[in-house]
Regions:
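Glycine/proline-rich active-site loop of Rossmann-fold NAD(P)-dependent oxidoreductases
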Residues: 58, 86, 111-126, 135, ...
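Hydrophobic pocket-lining residues that define ligand/cofactor binding sites across diverse proteins
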Residues: 38, 96, 131, 139, ...
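Conserved mid-core alpha-helix of short-chain dehydrogenase/reductase
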Residues: 29, 33-37, 149, 154-157, ...
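Catalytic Tyr-x(3-8)-Lys segment
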Residues: 73, 144-145
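Short aromatic/basic micro-patch
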Residues: 105, 149, 179
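N-terminal Rossmann-like NAD(P)+-binding domain of SDR-like oxidoreductases, especially those catalyzing
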Residues: 1-109
Length: 184
């Protein structure tokens, strides 16, 4: 085993609310097991993290850079995912510091693409199913809410490039530089 891509974790709000304990375990025990496997086989790892480690997006449109920490609600119902992703990054960093494992962190932003499950609580499939069913398109937030979108194929290319870099560049944000106002 030369390469491990660790993406095992629910990503839709409905799933990590329904499966809070499993989400928590995926971000802790699951990460540890992947890193123990990497330690055993001297494998390189790309760990799938998330932009949620930065906390809610500021209203002023501030773009987070990889060196910022962000702020999250440690006790919210989403904390199993949001704080779980921060904790998973800590596990990765500690394994690197203690055991020398070559682990890279990919912080994924809002990703979309083919085969996304419908009725799963993800923004793009929810818009599509609501439009097809003649329902209103519900936007969480107000008319100023903006988001960036990342096509899944571009994300896969980026993660593959991250895996193949000679040196670990540190955590990398995988998202678009283009913000889209959802009211458009």
């Amino acid at each position: 085993i030369q390469e491990i891509y660790h993406l095992a974790c629910p990503t839709s709000p409905k799933k990590f609310e329904q499966y809070r304990m499993q989400t928590l375990y995926a971000n802790s025990v699951g990460v540890r097991q992947a890193l123990d496997l990497a330690l055993r086989y001297k494998s390189r790892v790309v760990h799938a993290s998330s932009s949620v480690i930065y906390g809610p997006r500021p209203a002023d449109g501030h773009r987070f850079v990889e060196t910022e920490n962000g702020v999250n609600d440690l006790l919210s119902p989403r904390a199993c995912y949001d704080e779980g992703k921060r904790w998973a990054e800590t596990i990765c960093a500690t394994y690197h510091q203690v055991h020398g494992i070559d682990v890279r962190i990919a912080r994924m932003f809002r990703t979309y693409g083919p085969r996304m499950p419908l009725y799963d609580g993800q923004m793009i499939p929810d818009f599509i199913t609501n439009a097809l069913e003649g329902k209103d398109l519900e936007i969480f937030g107000d008319e100023t809410f903006r988001t960036s979108l990342m096509y899944v194929g571009d994300l896969v290319d980026g993660m593959t490039k991250l895996m193949n870099l000679a040196q670990d560049p540190g955590p990398i944000n995988f998202g678009s530089d283009i913000d889209i106002p959802l009211v458009d």
